[in-house]
C-alpha cells in the first residue's frame, strides 16, 4: 500500500504500479517457489491511494485473457498481478454507499478534519471500535499534520518577509 499526496506528474502511476507487482512476483523465486515450479507463485496486490484528485475514483487493473484466433484456453493463473488505484478528492464525499471506502480513507487522511470529526466518522458511520490505542494513533496523526501545517505557515511567513525586505516593500 502506498499513499501519494497527489497523482505524480513525473511518471505515469500505472507504470510504477506494474513495476512494483512485477518485482513482487519475481522476488518470490527461491522463497515461495524454486526451480521451475511457477504454479507456486502467490498472488500480489499493489494498492495506491492518491489524494487531492479531481474526483473520487477507484480502478482495478489486472491481466485478462482474450482469444484472438481460435478458442483455446491457456492454463495458468491470470489473477497473479493486481493493482488497485484509489483516488480521493480534496473534499470528503457525502455519506453514500458507493463512496464508503473514499469517505473512510478521506476522513483518516484529511488535513481539514479535526480529531473529533474523524472519530465521529470512523466510530459512528463505520462502527469501528475506537479503543484507546487507535484513538492515540489517530490523534498523533492529526497532531503531526497540524504540526506540519503550522511549520509550513511559519516558514512561508518568514520567506515572505525576507522577500519583502529584499524588494523594499
Predicted feature residues:
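Elongated, amphipathic alpha-helical interaction scaffolds
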Residues: 2-169
Amino acid at each position: 500500500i502506498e499513499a501519494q499526496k497527489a497523482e505524480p506528474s513525473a511518471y505515469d502511476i500505472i507504470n510504477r504500479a506494474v513495476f512494483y507487482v512485477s518485482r513482487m512476483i519475481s522476488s518470490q523465486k527461491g522463497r515461495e517457489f524454486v526451480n521451475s515450479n511457477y504454479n507456486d507463485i502467490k498472488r500480489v496486490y499493489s494498492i495506491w491511494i492518491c489524494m487531492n484528485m479531481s474526483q473520487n475514483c477507484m480502478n482495478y487493473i489486472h491481466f485478462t485473457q482474450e482469444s484472438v484466433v481460435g478458442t483455446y484456453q491457456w492454463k495458468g493463473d491470470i489473477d497473479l498481478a493486481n493493482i488497485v488505484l484509489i483516488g480521493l478528492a480534496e473534499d470528503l464525499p457525502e455519506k453514500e454507499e458507493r463512496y464508503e471506502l473514499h469517505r473512510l480513507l478521506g476522513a483518516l487522511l484529511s488535513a481539514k478534519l479535526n480529531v473529533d470529526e474523524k472519530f465521529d466518522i470512523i466510530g459512528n458511520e463505520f462502527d469501528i471500535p475506537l479503543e484507546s490505542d487507535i484513538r492515540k494513533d489517530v490523534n498523533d496523526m492529526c497532531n503531526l499534520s497540524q504540526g506540519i501545517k503550522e511549520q509550513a505557515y511559519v516558514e512561508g511567513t518568514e520567506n515572505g518577509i525576507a522577500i519583502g525586505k529584499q524588494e523594499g516593500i
